[in-house]
Amino acid sequence: MAGSGVRQAASTASTFVKPIFSRDMNEAKRRVRELYRAWYREVPNTVHQFQLDITVKMGRDKVREMFMKNAHVTDPRVVDLLVIKGKIELEETINVWKQQTHVMRFFHETEAPRPKDFLSKFYVGHDP
């Protein structure tokens, strides 16, 4: 008796998932644009404040790259989660809760993907 009620409640809860912030994808996209603009405006201040060895253009290109990395996401809840994480990163950067090494960690050269098959791992020297 109690088990069927729990099962019914679980099935009802799984069909009606409440979004985090955005009601639809258009609102989620608006939040992403706002975050992108905030990061874009903050790059010159960050470069100056942390005395980074990069230009403002390189910083803005990296911001664009980081946003384009998640351009394929279509679920509004996932987009909201990514926006929340981006706002937290922005706040930490603005308030100088990070050090220069934390900011420069974003500017490492893109790493080659790890090999998948045995021979490639052997040639590169990775453990299987």
UniProtKB/Swiss-Prot annotation:
It comes from the Eukaryota. The keyword Repressor does not apply. The modification Phosphoserine is found at residue 11. It holds the Pfam family Complex1_LYR_2. GO terms for biological process: mitochondrial respiratory chain complex I assembly; response to oxidative stress. Mammalian complex I is composed of 45 different subunits. Accessory subunit of the mitochondrial membrane respiratory chain NADH dehydrogenase (Complex I), that is believed to be not involved in catalysis. Required for proper complex I assembly. Complex I functions in the transfer of electrons from NADH to the respiratory chain. The immediate electron acceptor for the enzyme is believed to be ubiquinone. Belongs to the complex I LYR family. This is NADH dehydrogenase [ubiquinone] 1 alpha subcomplex subunit 6. The lineage of its organism: Eukaryota, Metazoa, Chordata, Craniata, Vertebrata.
